[in-house]
Structure formats: C-alpha cells, structure tokens
Amino acid sequence: MSESLSTSNDPLSQPSEPPTDIKALDFFRDDRLVADPAPYYEALRGQCPVLREPHQNVVMVTGYEEAVSVLNDAETFSSCTSVTGPFPGFPVPLEGRDDVSELIERHRDELPLNDQLPTFDPPVHTAHRGLLMRLITPKRLKENEAAIWNLADRVLDGYLVGGEGEFIGEFAGPFTLLVIADLLGVPEEDREEFLAHMHQRPQEGGGIGTTDGQSAAHSPMEYLYEQFAGYIEARRREPREDVLTGLATATFPDGTLPEVIDVVRVAANVFSAGQETTVRLLSSSLKVIAERPDIQHLLRTERDRIPNFVEEMLRTESPIKGDFRLSKVPVTVGGVDIPSGTTLMLLNGAANRDPRRFPDPDTLDPTRSNARQHIAFGRGIHSCPGAPLARAETRVGIERLLDRTTDIRVSDRVHGPADARDYRYIPTFILRGLTHLQLEFDVTEPNTESDTEGGHTA
C-alpha cells in the first residue's frame, strides 16, 4: 500500500503562496518553483517577454513569438548547451567577442552531453537528424501504433487489478518503455530486461537539470549504448528482416554508412528522451481526468475530443519546461539586444501560456481551437521527431483506460482530500512532472465490446 504523500512543509509540493519575486527566486535552484512555476513565468513576462534573470545570468524568454523566433534561427543560436544551459558553464569566457562560433566548435567536446543529438548544430545535426528520420519513418510509426493498443492492454491487465494503483510506476512507465522498445525493434526476449533496467530510475531527482546543483549524468544512457551497440554490430554482420537491421544499414543523407556509435547515439536518445517526456504527459493528463469529473465525462462520451485534450495538456503542462540556446553573434529578440555568448532559456511552459497567443491561457479547455499551436515539442530543426508517437501513446493510453473503467479518481488516502491535495513534482528546471500519482478506479466488466475489439480503429 502506498503511504500518504502529505508534505505540508515540502517545497516540492504546492506552496501556500505563489512565488513570484524574480530577484529573490533562483529558477534553477529554488524548489519553491518546482510545483507550480506558472506564477513565476507570469511575473517574468509581466516585466518583459525577454528578461535576464539575476542569479545565473540567463535571458529568460517567456513570450510565444519571441521563443518561436529563436527556435527557428539555428544560424544565430547554437544548441551546444541546449540541455544543461548555464551549468557547469562554458569552458572559456565568451564575453566581449563579436562572434563566438569558432570558440563553440573549439570547445564543444568539453561540454556536457556533447554527444547527444539535441546539442548538435548544423551540419553535424543535419546529417544525424537525417539518419534519425530514416529510422522513424511514417511506415514504422504506423506499424508501431498498431502495437500500442496491445501494449496498453498488456500493462493495464496488471495495473487495474485491485481497483487502485500508482499510475506512473505501474502503468505509464512500463507502457511507454515497451512502446519505444517496439518502435526501435528491441527483441521481444530482451524487453523485460530493458524494463527492469530502465524502469528502476529514481523518480525524485538525480537526473539532468536537478535543482540540487548535481552535474548531469549519462546513466542510463550507458546501458542503452551498450545494448544498441551489440544489436547494430550483430545486424551488420548478419542482416535479418527486422527493424534492427534497418537501423544497422541506415545511411546518412549523403549515402555514407554511419559509424556504429552514430546509430547508437540516435537510437539511445530516442529511447531515453521519448520515454521520459511521454510518462510526464500521460501522468499530467490522468491527473486532470481524475480530478475533473466534467472533463472525464466529456472524454468518455465524446472520444473524438481526446486528441485536442492531449494538445491542451501539452500546452498547459509542457513536459519540458524549456530549452537553452547560446547566441553566436549579437542579436535582437523581441526588441531586446542580446550580446554574443549569451545563454537564453526558451520557456515552453511560459510561451504556451502567453495571453497574446492563447486567450485565457491558464484555463484548461479541451475544446480550445488553437491548442495545437503550442511549442511543447519545440520548433525548427530541433523539433521533436517523436511527437507523433507521444501523441499516439497518450491518446491510446487514455482511450483504453476509459474503455476499461467506469470511473477514475485520485486517491484521497495518498494525496489528501480534494480541497487540499498534495502532489510532488520532479525537482528539475528541465522536466515538468509528478513523481507519483495514486489512482482509484471502477473497472468495467470483462469481455465488453470495446475490450474484445480494442475500442479503436487503427
């Protein structure tokens, strides 16, 4: 049985007063901003949509148009520090130079996570992104979506037993991990090992962007590197008619065969990043469904509303709080002059609540007509290639949970009464998501039409 998460003095749970003092609060270190950063975002944007915060010297971009303009400008802005931002800092001073492009390339290998696709710039990024898009083709995504329904039911079979369960650890985590494993062709006999190894990661910190100031670690990437290197090398020696052989023989856009490590990096990044963010999206979606009977009723009776509900969840609860960019040359963003060598944080979660783009932005509206204009998946050359998969996983997960239950509720025993909930959030300035979500549900009778036919059209 899960213990109560009551944490009245815990900064990782909801604060009693919204923290908005920009001068007093360090976004990258203050746990008071973890549970609900929206008031802080609004305070930033209220001063200026492009504003330098005083603690880490980062220019915070909270405006929608301003963020999109930066995301679309890979010529002016480098992604070399896109994951870690100002930490641990650039190896050499960048101030006072007209163009820091040469310094970036000279010291790129000294930066954290420099072997990961999100930190690449053109032309290296162009080649590796091209390789990635040869792995995640529309045909492969369609094949994978057909398997998503079965995988959802497979995990739900165990999760729904007993009438309650911890959603993130018992459903969202295993489900999304198995979906990614299927997409990348991990052999069926190896998937339980992947599940055991990858799903034992700590839920409450220790990863990239933690507010405790710990440096970024590569685990569990090292495990993924080892596994996929073995797969790729084996398929190059002995090709088969399977997805892994497609991975092993995929070429760069110019037709050259990548080194094994290049393929491994792309596959491992898709596996790790895609699984983590979709878990957060699924859990935030189910929290709303369980907390809001009106929305649950709407989605149960009008299933065609689910895709737009997912978009609205991406807008209001962006799983990635933001991405970083480093200005290579002096530039103006939203009327604000930015010197070369400046770290900017593009706050997706703030831009997605910009009232200039989204009227009444703090209201979650499943019928919002422009919900899909959010930038939760980024824009430009680094936009998330797995966005169609994340959308499909979340839609299918919601549909099958609704098919197989008649009511879903948040556990009062674990999270407290409805008027005084306690939720804990991951203490990072990168990810936005719950650490636990205990749900209770009334399960439908087996062998209903939706169960036997899958409740969907593929």
Feature-to-residue mapping (PLM):
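Cytochrome P450
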Residues: 1-458
